[in-house]
């Protein structure tokens, strides 16, 4: 098929990874995929690696910036819009698909001005600033979590595109004649509160329910985190990164982690129960809303960072580790919330809009 699609996503993996999954699906259907990003985001590494054409515009976020930056903002946004319009004219896409990040504001407006159908995908339970603005004139809005957007005539609940290898056929049976396996995820940059909390909490558990521990600490945090475990007499494998997440999820019986949108979707895909500690200063407290999606159905417990010390974490760990059937039930519930067709569904929506 001789047709171009322009994907907009930038900044963090939370925006870029779902967009990459959809880019591969577009390519499988014969579309040529172009990508609109910014010079400083993770897309600069990942998009060329995927063999996609990357176009860059100069735009940054405005939250938390000083007065001088805010005074310069209108000029920056105007320049970014002009750059985005040039890309849209050059690519001539049948549709423009935004997955979030600063790039989507100017890019989405450029699509609107050019009369090109715009579709946006929101990964979080609370829409980001750019997507909230674009939703008013987008042709369609895809949401990972139900009722993120108010306009039911435009929205489609698709789930988050995640790696297909994470979808286990059936959830594992936890504690099947062995020690429980606890996976701690701090994210690529690490979550120092989790790195401090878990060693102390695990040291308070009775020896007979001590789990095997695999702790992803984040870059430059592995040595000190491993030392914390040694100091309290808890055996743990500590790594700065986990290269094979599918293998790690397949190993685990229980996960302690933040509540980023992709993490929530991956936990559901893998059918894993979790103890979620939302990032307390996330924009619009979106991680708490993400966590509620699993917690209200019984697939997770939410443990606010401000009220969760070592004693509280130890008590919750003891509760779930001593009840294998509860872990199994949480795992089944998590798996029931997965959206295995999310990638295809998002691309189907785009194709319908582009050619409908």
Swiss-Prot record:
The keyword Cell cycle applies. UDP-N-acetyl-alpha-D-glucosamine binds at residues 12-14, 124, 163, 188, 242, 287. GO terms for biological process: carbohydrate metabolic process; cell division; cell wall organization; lipid glycosylation; peptidoglycan biosynthetic process; regulation of cell shape. It comes from the Bacteria. Its EC number is 2.4.1.227. Signal peptide: none annotated. It is found in: Cell inner membrane. It catalyses: di-trans,octa-cis-undecaprenyl diphospho-N-acetyl-alpha-D-muramoyl-L-alanyl-D-glutamyl-meso-2,6-diaminopimeloyl-D-alanyl-D-alanine + UDP-N-acetyl-alpha-D-glucosamine = di-trans,octa-cis-undecaprenyl diphospho-[N-acetyl-alpha-D-glucosaminyl-(1->4)]-N-acetyl-alpha-D-muramoyl-L-alanyl-D-glutamyl-meso-2,6-diaminopimeloyl-D-alanyl-D-alanine + UDP + H(+). Pathway: Cell wall biogenesis; peptidoglycan biosynthesis. It holds the Pfam family Glyco_tran_28_C. InterPro entries: GlcNAc_MurG, Glyco_trans_28_C, GlycoTrans_28_N. GO terms for cellular component: plasma membrane. Transmembrane segments: none annotated. Keywords: Cell cycle, Cell division, Cell inner membrane, Cell membrane, Cell shape, Cell wall biogenesis/degradation, Glycosyltransferase, Membrane, Peptidoglycan synthesis, Transferase. It is a peripheral membrane protein. One of its GO terms (molecular function) is undecaprenyldiphospho-muramoylpentapeptide beta-N-acetylglucosaminyltransferase activity. Belongs to the glycosyltransferase 28 family. MurG subfamily. Cell wall formation. Catalyzes the transfer of a GlcNAc subunit on undecaprenyl-pyrophosphoryl-MurNAc-pentapeptide (lipid intermediate I) to form undecaprenyl-pyrophosphoryl-MurNAc-(pentapeptide)GlcNAc (lipid intermediate II). This is UDP-N-acetylglucosamine--N-acetylmuramyl-(pentapeptide) pyrophosphoryl-undecaprenol N-acetylglucosamine transferase. The gene is murG.
């Amino acid at each position: 098929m001789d047709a171009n699609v322009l994907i907009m996503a930038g900044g963090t993996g939370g925006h870029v990874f779902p967009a990459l999954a959809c880019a591969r699906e577009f390519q499988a259907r014969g579309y040529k995929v172009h990508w609109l990003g910014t010079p400083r985001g993770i897309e600069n590494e990942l998009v060329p690696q995927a063999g996609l054409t990357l176009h860059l515009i100069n735009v940054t976020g405005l939250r938390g910036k000083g007065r001088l930056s805010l005074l310069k903002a209108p000029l920056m946004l105007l320049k970014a819009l002009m750059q985005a319009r040039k890309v849209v004219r050059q690519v001539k896409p049948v549709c423009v698909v935004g997955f979030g990040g600063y790039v989507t504001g100017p890019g989405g407006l450029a699509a609107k001005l050019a009369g090109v159908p715009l579709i946006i995908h929101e990964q979080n339970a609370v829409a980001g600033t750019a997507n909230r603005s674009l939703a008013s004139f987008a042709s369609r809005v895809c949401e990972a979590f139900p009722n993120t957007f108010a306009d039911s005539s435009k929205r489609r609940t698709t789930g988050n595109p995640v790696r297909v290898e994470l979808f286990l056929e059936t959830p594992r049976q936890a504690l099947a004649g062995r020690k429980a396996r606890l996976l701690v995820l701090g994210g690529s940059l690490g979550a120092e509160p989790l790195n401090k909390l878990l060693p102390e909490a695990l040291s308070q558990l009775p020896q007979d329910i001590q789990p095997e521990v695999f702790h992803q600490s984040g870059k430059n945090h592995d040595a000190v985190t491993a030392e914390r475990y040694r100091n309290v007499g808890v055996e743990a494998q500590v790594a700065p990164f986990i290269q094979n997440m599918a293998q790690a999820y397949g190993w685990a019986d229980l996960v302690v982690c933040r509540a980023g949108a992709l993490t929530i979707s991956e936990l559901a895909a893998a059918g894993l129960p979790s103890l979620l500690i939302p990032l307390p200063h996330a924009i619009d407290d979106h991680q708490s809303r993400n966590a509620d999606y699993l917690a209200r159905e019984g697939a997770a417990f939410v443990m606010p960072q401000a009220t969760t010390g070592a004693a509280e974490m130890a008590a919750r760990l003891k509760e779930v580790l001593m009840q294998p059937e509860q872990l199994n039930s949480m795992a089944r519930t998590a798996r029931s919330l997965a959206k295995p067709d999310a990638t295809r569904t998002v691309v189907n929506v785009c194709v319908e809009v582009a050619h409908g």
